[in-house]
C-alpha cells in the first residue's frame, strides 16, 4: 500500500478531487473573515482547517478529546476546547462570529437539531460555513447516519432556523462524481495487485528456505 500511496501522491488533485476542491473553497471563505473574529469549529477532529483561520480566535468542539498521540501527529495542534454533545455545546447564546461545520452533519443522529444549536450560538449577522456530502460510501462507522444533503434540505432547514442570504454551491458535477468513483476503484485495484505481489514474494521466499 505504501507503494501505491507514493505512486498516487503526485496525482492527488485528481484522485482526491472533492476534498481538494472543498479545501480550496474553505480557504477562500476564510480569507473573507475579518481578523480577530471568533470562530467555533464544530466536529473539529484533528483540526485540519486550523491554519486557514490563524487570523481568527479559533475554538474547537467535538464529542471526544484527542489522544496525546493524535495531538502529536497533528503537529502540535491543541486539544479540543469543548468536548460535548453537538446538541448541547457549553457556550452562551450568540457567542461566535463564525461557525465552521465541515463534513459533520452526516455523522450526527439529529442534524436538524444540530442546525438549531448552531443558530443559537451564532451571533446575529454571523457566518455559517457548512459542507456535507450529497453522496458518499460508508465511513467513520458506526457514526455515519445519513447518505447526503440536497440544496433543498439546506434551504428548508437553514431558513427555518433563522438563516438568510444562503449561498449554496455544488462541489463538482455528476461527471466528477463518476470520475472520483472510478479513480477510487482503480486505486483499490492497484492496492490489491501490490498485496498479491507481496504475498507472492513471501511464498517464493518460503520455498527458497
Cite the ranges covered by each PLM segment.
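Class I SAM-dependent methyltransferase Rossmann-like catalytic core
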Residues: 1-33
Amino acid at each position: 500500500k505504501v507503494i501505491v500511496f507514493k505512486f498516487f501522491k503526485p496525482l492527488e488533485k485528481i484522485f482526491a478531487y472533492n476534498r481538494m476542491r472543498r479545501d480550496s473553497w474553505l480557504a477562500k471563505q476564510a480569507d473573507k473573515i475579518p481578523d480577530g473574529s471568533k470562530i467555533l469549529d464544530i466536529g473539529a477532529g484533528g483540526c485540519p482547517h486550523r491554519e486557514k483561520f490563524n487570523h481568527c480566535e479559533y475554538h474547537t468542539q467535538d464529542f471526544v478529546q484527542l489522544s496525546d498521540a493524535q495531538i502529536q501527529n497533528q503537529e502540535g495542534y491543541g486539544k479540543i476546547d469543548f468536548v460535548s454533545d453537538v446538541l448541547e455545546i457549553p457556550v452562551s447564546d450568540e457567542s461566535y462570529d463564525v461557525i465552521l461545520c465541515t463534513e459533520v452533519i452526516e455523522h450526527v443522529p439529529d442534524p436538524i437539531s444540530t442546525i438549531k444549536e448552531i443558530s443559537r450560538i451564532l451571533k446575529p449577522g454571523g457566518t455559517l460555513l457548512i459542507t456535507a456530502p450529497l453522496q458518499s460510501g460508508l465511513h467513520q462507522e458506526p457514526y455515519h447516519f445519513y447518505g447526503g444533503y440536497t440544496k433543498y434540505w439546506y434551504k428548508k432547514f437553514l431558513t427555518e432556523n433563522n438563516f438568510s442570504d444562503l449561498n449554496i454551491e455544488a462541489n463538482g458535477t455528476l461527471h466528477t462524481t463518476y470520475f472520483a468513483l472510478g479513480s477510487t476503484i482503480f486505486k483499490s485495484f492497484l492496492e490489491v495487485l501490490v498485496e498479491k505481489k507481496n504475498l507472492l514474494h513471501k511464498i517464493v521466499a518460503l520455498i527458497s528456505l
